[in-house]
Amino acid sequence: MQNTIQSLLAVLVLAMSCFERLSGQSQPPLDTLDAQQKSIVSIAALTAKGDLTGLKKELNKGLDADLTIMKIKECLVHTYAYCGFPRSIRGIQSFMAVLEERKSKGIQDAMGVDASPVPQGGSKYERGKKILGELTKAPQDQPLAAYSVFAPAIDTFLKEHLFADIFERDVLSYAERELVTISVLSAIGNAEPMLRSHFAIC
């Protein structure tokens, strides 16, 4: 497990420019991630792999690094878009068990802030296109191509659900969501085109 995390950290350190570009924060040194960012990487990757034993250890580390309950929950929810509901739900169940165990030991973890209400006006598809444009810094007015033409429903789901329903939730910044995304894609393997696309966002 430790080798998996170390190799992921080596890849993901390249994505830290996301924090400069997407959240306006100063870019950290490229050889370091802070404790919370490392926890986000590990939690997302281990959830995607289904390594629940390792995940519980990293969930504890994340809480000890002052990641809030809400932020960790949101990381786990976000993973389902890339590794599916079963892995995400098992991660959430593992987190529930960790919180119960910590509570039984008298540990009080910070709840944090829940998501603000998401916008309800306008077309969800257009809202998703707008967010994707913000992330990629490229207009999203090109005609559909490749897999989006072959299976247009997937384009609709990506725009309306992933980039509207999920990315509009403000518990995590865009940069934090990209850390989760790249961690999951790195962990599941055979997703190099998607991984390249998300690195390009950074």
Mark where each language-model region is.
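Amphipathic, charged-and-aliphatic alpha-helical interface segments
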Residues: 38-49, 178-191
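Short conserved catalytic/interaction loops centered on acidic-Pro-aromatic/His motifs
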Residues: 192-199
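Bacterial Sec-dependent N-terminal signal peptides
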Residues: 1-27
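Acidic, glycine/proline-rich low-complexity segments that act as flexible tails and inter-domain linkers
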Residues: 22-37, 48-65, 70-71, 81, ...
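Non-catalytic tandem-repeat scaffold regions and their flanking low-complexity/translocation tails
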Residues: 75-76
